[in-house]
Amino acid sequence: MLTFLRANFRWLACGFLLTLFSSFGQTFFIGLSGSEIRRTFHLSGGAFGGLYMLATLGSALTLPWLGRLLDIMPAWRVALFVLPALAASCLIFPFMPNVVGLAIGLYLLRLFGQGMMTETAYTVVGRWFSANRGRAISLIVPGHQTGEAVLPLAFVLISSWLGWQGAW
């Protein structure tokens, strides 16, 4: 196993980090700001849930079209597009001026985080590894769990200092 890790560290680290960074578009992370978002935009729980559902469905409907880029371009090039797109989404999301902007921000987070980041990770690793694909995937999937374990605590600590918008 160590030989496999050493020989393929670059690809495994890339996949792990992509799955880790997908956390910013996952429900567990966005939900950390749910109360503040509802308060800021004067939304009920149901209204926010409906908006979130629409953003998620929009992302799901867009994913096959955007994901097609992975079929026609090198995965590393797609990653070089998806990473800055997710970073920009994280930066603009908390400062959207109205509910329409909030919906767009949620859509972008869901599309580039939960959707494209994960799809790119699995595609990069799936293409690179043919004989050991299952082993490789099993080594990048913990990026999701690492995000679930570490990022909520980091977000809560940072938001206690900078507020929810500053933490994003």
Feature locations, PLM:
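Residue-level signature of mid-helix packing/kink "hotspots" within the transmembrane helices
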Residues: 28, 56-64, 148-149
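Intracellular juxtamembrane helix-capping segments at the cytosolic ends
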Residues: 115-129
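C-terminal ends and interior cores of transmembrane alpha-helices
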Residues: 84-97
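Helix-loop-helix hairpin linking two adjacent transmembrane segments in secondary transporters
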Residues: 144-168
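Pair of pore-lining "gating" transmembrane helices in MFS-fold secondary transporters
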Residues: 6-29
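Helix-to-loop junctions at the C-terminal end of transmembrane segments
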Residues: 61-74
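Primarily marks hydrophobic transmembrane alpha-helices of the MFS/SLC 12-helix fold
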Residues: 76-79
